[in-house]
Amino acid sequence: MKNEPIYNLLNSINSPDDLRRLEVDQLPEVCDELRQDIIKELSCNPGHFAASLGTVELTVALHYVYNTPYDRIVWDVGHQAYGHKILTGRREAFSTNRKLGGIRPFPSPEESEYDTFTCGHASNSISAALGMAVAAAKKGDDQRHVIAIIGDGSMSGGLAFEGLNNSSTTPNNLLIILNDNDMAIDRSVGGMKQYLFNLTTSNRYNQLRFKASRLLFKLGILNDERRKALIRFGNSLKSMAAQQQNIFEGMNIRYFGPIDGHDIKNLSRVLRDIKDLKGPKILHLHTIKGKGFAPAEKHATEWHAPGKFDPVTGERFVANTEGMPPLFQDVFGNTLVELAEANPRIVGVTPAMPSGCSMNILMSKMPKRAFDVGIAEGHAVTFSGGMAKDGLQPFCNIYSSFMQRAYDNIIHDVAIQNLPVVLCLDRAGLVGEDGPTHHGAFDMAYLRPIPNLTIASPMNEHELRRLMYTAQLPDKGPFVLRYPRGRGVLVDWKCPLEEIPVGKGRKLKDGKDIAVISIGPIGNKARSAIARAESESGRSIAHYDLRFLKPLDEELLHEVGRTFRHIVTIEDGTIQGGMGSAVLEFMADHEYTPTVKRIGIPDKFVQHGTVAELYQLCGMDEDSLTKELLKQCELLPDMSKIKELTN
């Protein structure tokens, strides 16, 4: 590769112990080399790019000042932790990041003792870190420090506020680092964003900040005891002057900052100075997402996970998609605009994922009818419920794995009142390289028991458009649409917007030996597998697209129960409690006794890899489905022998 970086210091760092042997004056060079290593690796092995560039100095400072892994670092989300992985002994394996069998996309305790808590979703770091701090205190370990790292985007989550509220009542060694870069994946939104901006820019606070900076400079010549005494005195002055305008100080959490999160020497010095102060503390850092790579600094959203690129020029290697089917996300976004143009009651809601779910299409064309509520899934659902209660028709788009966080809101604030909220579950099924925290495996199983819900999963883009149209018609109540990440199957995806009768599936193909019942896009793999199995076995296999998990198409299922002795169900959700379970229950309730083989995501947390690899791993790819259908064909009676016996 051109301009291959030279790592004079990074090559000698295999653990934080090696880092701590360096002089503080060497840390800027370590940061430069670490940043270049991240750029080099991710240019050819794609992952979460911009966030990790923004936390290089913070990562180095934490492992330099604190005695990790004895001291605990808890990352929020984990998008920003690649530097942490490299410094903690995983540099040689980093090229396997997010690959099947390779290191994991987010910090994981199963992978390293330096990864103290599983992450992937937002806003949980403060609560987890507080729990660790309390555990240390209960065990009499008053030397252990626990540090939570949370971004300003995650601070909009209710769980973060719950953790802050509880932290304020404990005397434990907890440090909360607020990594303020004005970004989640997209721009941060809401009152907390504005509050942090005001906290930084107010004249009154800047005066205090300037005085504190002068004081810290002078403290450099003092011994440790005097330094700590003066810091306590300075914090008392700051508290008296700023407590009324500082939400953290008002919650009895000592506030330090804001400081430049890219000044490694000063950051290390501040961490040392506040390290041994007892009680909960928060250090506010200003960082730049994408720091050190100009294209990422300028366009942080596009460079959140950019794919492959040239590490020198920044040119992104974008695949040629001409002639390919569209993304399900873009079909959703464009269809929503089409519906909103005809139905003035329609509004869109997303919790901090406007670009990921294509809600940004509605935002750009009808900005007053689209709402990014920040990382706040429960609020997004209840907010939608409130709008629906007074006559609007919300389309609330939340990734399937994140909708888990809003379960009570769905029941209490939408379903009980039978409110017409359309819950759009993006990223349903296996999502690939982000792994178990992000797979949309459980939605059918956890939503199926809730009364009043309609639950549908389209097989293709035409079905998605028609179901979206159906969902916004009068008197449909709460309506769930689940669809996968990635491309559909139809190049010509536009079709007339027509109503689909609620609870009605469809027969895709006649057959007489085996009935295959599928739901959602995996039905396309099932269709191909059926054709192959019929060709190899000579048997006749029927195919039904159930389309609706709730209400079930009872007429269709009665037909299947009366006609077939062998049924195969195929779904892209967990096998426990999903569509296959619903079919089994129906057959038992109506005293049909077929053999039912269920195919779906197994009862385990599926790790990371490409979507194709994971479908193969779970026995849900076309080849595996074909083999299973052939196995079922072998269980059928030999018709030639039956004919001989009857003659």
Swiss-Prot record:
Pfam families linked: DXP_synthase_N (PF13292), Transket_pyr (PF02779), Transketolase_C (PF02780)
PROSITE patterns tied to this protein: TRANSKETOLASE_2 (PS00802)
Matching InterPro entries: Dxylulose-5-P_synthase, THDP-binding, Transketo_C/PFOR_II, Transketolase-like_Pyr-bd, Transketolase_BS, Transketolase_C
GO molecular function: 1-deoxy-D-xylulose-5-phosphate synthase activity; magnesium ion binding; thiamine pyrophosphate binding
Tagged with keyword Transferase: yes
Source taxon at top rank: Bacteria
Keywords: Isoprene biosynthesis, Magnesium, Metal-binding, Thiamine biosynthesis, Thiamine pyrophosphate, Transferase
Catalytic activity: D-glyceraldehyde 3-phosphate + pyruvate + H(+) = 1-deoxy-D-xylulose 5-phosphate + CO2
Pathway assigned in UniProt: Metabolic intermediate biosynthesis; 1-deoxy-D-xylulose 5-phosphate biosynthesis; 1-deoxy-D-xylulose 5-phosphate from D-glyceraldehyde 3-phosphate and pyruvate: step 1/1
GO cellular component, one term: cytosol
UniProt cross-references to SUPFAM superfamilies, sorted A to Z: Thiamin diphosphate-binding fold (THDP-binding) (SSF52518), TK C-terminal domain-like (SSF52922)
EC number: 2.2.1.7
Cofactor note: Binds 1 Mg(2+) ion per subunit. Binds 1 thiamine pyrophosphate per subunit.
Residues reported in the UniProt entry to bind Mg(2+): 152, 181
GO BP: any one term: thiamine biosynthetic process
Cofactor or coenzyme needed: Mg(2+); thiamine diphosphate
SMART domains, sorted: Transket_pyr
Subunit structure: Homodimer.
PANTHER family on file: 1-D-DEOXYXYLULOSE 5-PHOSPHATE SYNTHASE-RELATED, 1-DEOXY-D-XYLULOSE-5-PHOSPHATE SYNTHASE, CHLOROPLASTIC
Similarity field: Belongs to the transketolase family. DXPS subfamily.
Protein name per Swiss-Prot or TrEMBL: 1-deoxy-D-xylulose-5-phosphate synthase
Recorded name of the encoding gene: dxs
